[in-house]
């Protein structure tokens, strides 16, 4: 098994910690909030309020299920537009009250169904990109599994983007890439090697800012590492003047 195929397998492992796991293990007193105030509540995106080292924060993330029944309720971690609108509602609320935002990302991509398109999937994603680029509070995004396409990017326009060691981040799935390029989805591993989807490759290109180690660590130790890094980096980001924070975020994405 090549390194990239191993990363693909581990990134998609159903046993990985989910957004709700991290929300309850890293933060104190997490309280989930529901609904986009327009259409419905999307189970594929969860979010709410919590405390980190005594400071109020907003936590938002894409939630996959841990079994078939849970996955059906969570739409296999593929958000509908109402999920992205719920996330934006919580981010604007965080901006109003001066709370830092932490997002967790694990999705193959936004849901491509007819209903999602009819309800404005593209608009919902685009609006998140626009609003996050100018959100007046610190944002840290963490990829905890798959980071697929615009569905992942809609929660990843952040001051810092981190990846766990065995996760992936790409414009689309390797299977989709292979199907488009070669009309053969079975060449997914070959496609993944061309796409440069691993944490190490993306760190070298400056697309991600930090890699959270996983190899040789228990889940509880990984949680502790993320928590310590979040406390350190949020404190650092909050110390920056607002104009500098927003300009650095803008320049971070313009350099691509």
UniProtKB/Swiss-Prot annotation:
Give the main location: cytoplasm
Residues covered by the CoA carboxyltransferase C-terminal domain: 1-236
| Catalytic EC class | transferase
Pfam families reported in the protein's UniProt record: ACCA (PF03255)
Q: Where in the cell is it found?
A: Cytoplasm
An individual GO BP term: malonyl-CoA biosynthetic process
Provide the reaction this enzyme catalyses: N(6)-carboxybiotinyl-L-lysyl-[protein] + acetyl-CoA = N(6)-biotinyl-L-lysyl-[protein] + malonyl-CoA
Q: Which SUPFAM superfamilies match?
A: ClpP/crotonase (SSF52096)
Keywords, alphabetical: ATP-binding, Cytoplasm, Fatty acid biosynthesis, Fatty acid metabolism, Lipid biosynthesis, Lipid metabolism, Nucleotide-binding, Transferase
Molecular-function GO terms, alphabetical: acetyl-CoA carboxylase activity; ATP binding; carboxyl- or carbamoyltransferase activity
The EC number(s) given in the record are: 2.1.3.15
The cross-references to Gene3D superfamilies, in alphabetical order and at most eight, read:
2-enoyl-CoA Hydratase, Chain A, domain 1 (3.90.226.10)
Pathway it works in: Lipid metabolism; malonyl-CoA biosynthesis; malonyl-CoA from acetyl-CoA: step 1/1
**What does the record note on quaternary structure?**
Acetyl-CoA carboxylase is a heterohexamer composed of biotin carboxyl carrier protein (AccB), biotin carboxylase (AccC) and two subunits each of ACCase subunit alpha (AccA) and ACCase subunit beta (AccD).
The record's listing under PANTHER family reads: ACETYL-COENZYME A CARBOXYLASE CARBOXYL TRANSFERASE SUBUNIT ALPHA, ACETYL-COENZYME A CARBOXYLASE CARBOXYL TRANSFERASE SUBUNIT ALPHA, CHLOROPLASTIC
HAMAP family assigned to the protein according to its UniProt record, in alphabetical order: AcetylCoA_CT_alpha
Q: Which family is it part of? A: Belongs to the AccA family.
Q: What does this protein do?
A: Component of the acetyl coenzyme A carboxylase (ACC) complex. First, biotin carboxylase catalyzes the carboxylation of biotin on its carrier protein (BCCP) and then the CO(2) group is transferred by the carboxyltransferase to acetyl-CoA to form malonyl-CoA.
Q: Which NCBIfam families match?
A: accA, AccA_sub, PRK05724.1, PRK12319.1
The entry's protein name is Acetyl-coenzyme A carboxylase carboxyl transferase subunit alpha
- Record the organism: Streptococcus pyogenes serotype M5 (strain Manfredo)
- Lineage, please? Bacteria, Bacillati, Bacillota, Bacilli, Lactobacillales
């Amino acid at each position: 098994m090549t390194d990239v195929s191993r990363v693909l397998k581990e990134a998609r492992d159903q046993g990985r910690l989910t957004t709700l796991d991290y929300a309850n293990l890293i933060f104190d007193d997490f309280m989930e909030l529901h609904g986009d105030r327009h259409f419905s509540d999307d189970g594929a995106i969860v979010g709410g309020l919590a405390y980190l080292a005594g400071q109020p924060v907003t936590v938002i993330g894409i939630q996959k299920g841990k079994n078939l029944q849970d996955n059906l309720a969570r739409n296999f971690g593929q958000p509908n537009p109402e999920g992205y609108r719920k996330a934006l509602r919580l981010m604007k609320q965080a901006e109003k009250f001066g709370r830092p935002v932490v997002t967790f990302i694990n999705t193959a991509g936004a849901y491509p169904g007819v209903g999602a398109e009819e309800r404005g999937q593209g608009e919902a994603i685009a609006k998140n990109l626009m609003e996050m680029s100018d959100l007046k509070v610190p944002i840290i995004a963490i990829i905890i599994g798959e980071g697929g396409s615009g569905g992942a990017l809609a929660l990843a326009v952040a001051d810092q983007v981190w990846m766990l060691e065995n996760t992936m981040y790409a414009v689309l799935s390797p299977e989709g890439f292979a199907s488009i390029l070669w009309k053969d989805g079975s060449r997914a591993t070959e496609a993944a090697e061309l796409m440069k989807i691993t944490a190490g490759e993306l760190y070298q290109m400056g697309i991600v800012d930090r890699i959270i180690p996983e190899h040789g660590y228990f889940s509880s130790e990984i949680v502790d590492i993320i928590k310590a890094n979040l406390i350190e980096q949020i404190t650092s980001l909050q110390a920056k003047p607002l104009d500098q924070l927003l300009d650095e975020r803008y320049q971070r994405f313009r350099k691509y």
